[in-house]
Structures are given as C-alpha cells and as structure tokens.
Amino acid sequence: MRGKKCWKRVTAVLMAFMMLVGLVMTNGITSEAYWYNSEGGRYPNVGYRTHVQSKGWERTLTLNGRTSGTVGAGKRLEAIQIIVEPGYGVGVEYRTHIQSKGWEKTWKKDGETSGTSGEAKRLEAIQIRLTGTNKNKYDIYYRVHAQTYGWLGWAKNGSIAGTSGLAKRLEAIQIVIIPKGEHAPNPLPAAPGTAAYVH
C-alpha cells in the first residue's frame, strides 16, 4: 500500500514537471528553466527573462529575486517575459512603458512578451500583479535598475517601478513572490526609502 502511494506521488510530480515544461516551451521561454526556492515550497517560484540591447533574449530564466539584465554595461532592456510556477493557483500579468509608445494598452500574462524586439526601444517602467484564485495569499515585489539612478526601491502588486518623462532606460530587474504580509525583500543595495518610481 505504501509503495502504491509513493508511486502515485512520483507520478504526480512527473506530470506537474511535464506540464511546466510544456507551458514554458509554449510561451517561448527556454525549457532549460528550473524551479527552486529555499522555503520548501511555501510560495511559488517566479521566473523571468529579458531582451537586452545588442544581446537579445537571455537563454535561461532568472529566478526569485536574482538579477535579469545588466548592471554597469549601459544596455537597455527592450522586452520581458514572466512566468509563475504552476500548482499554487497563481498567475501573473504585467505591462511596460516603452520609449515613444508609452504604456501598453493590454496587460501581458504568463510568459507572454511585453515590450519590443528589433525596434531599439527602451523599457522605462513596469507594472506586475498576480492573478488567479490564490492571488490574495501572496505579494509580488519587483525593482528595477534605471539609467542614472541605479537600483530603485521595491514596488509591489501592480504599482509602478521605473521612470517616466525622463528618457531613462531600464537596465535590470529583480522579481520575487512572498507570502502575503511578510516583510519586504532586503532593500540593499538600494538605500532604504528609495522610491520605486521616479517621474
């Protein structure tokens, strides 16, 4: 009986992994993605990758607060894709403010591309929010590295991160999901109290 339960569990895990790989590949995000967080599955992993000036799309997903993009290289972000680990009843949607175009009229979701490629347009700001039946159980935090300003403060749950009206490019981004109401991510290296949005 015990062996049967163990086999069912292994089968369920394999099915979930296959669904994840299928979702990742369907949305154009590399299947080299892997999922891990140090909290033992208390909250969903978030993966993201950016399209960087003169480099194109990053080949693999960046996870859970790590930096996607470049710092100190003077390269603009041109587009982004974001995806949340399945199985938690949570999805993600996002939109960007694009050079000479302004805010996208529609929100992109679950691995879709927000921004442009091949047009040499910089991203200037971003909004990200959770969707799904369990969206109110978590907060999504994100911050950007902006031209001239460096790392800005953390934004969360659909608020704006970046700049507008200043012609400043986004250069890098960090995104993390945590249980609702827990403390915000460590503010370093941005100074405590640094605004998430400059305009």
Protein language model regions, located:
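Secretory targeting and sorting signals
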Residues: 11-25
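Lectin-type carbohydrate-recognition ectodomains
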Residues: 33-199
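Sec-dependent signal peptide cleavage junction
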Residues: 21-39
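Bacterial N-terminal signal peptides that target proteins for export
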Residues: 2-14
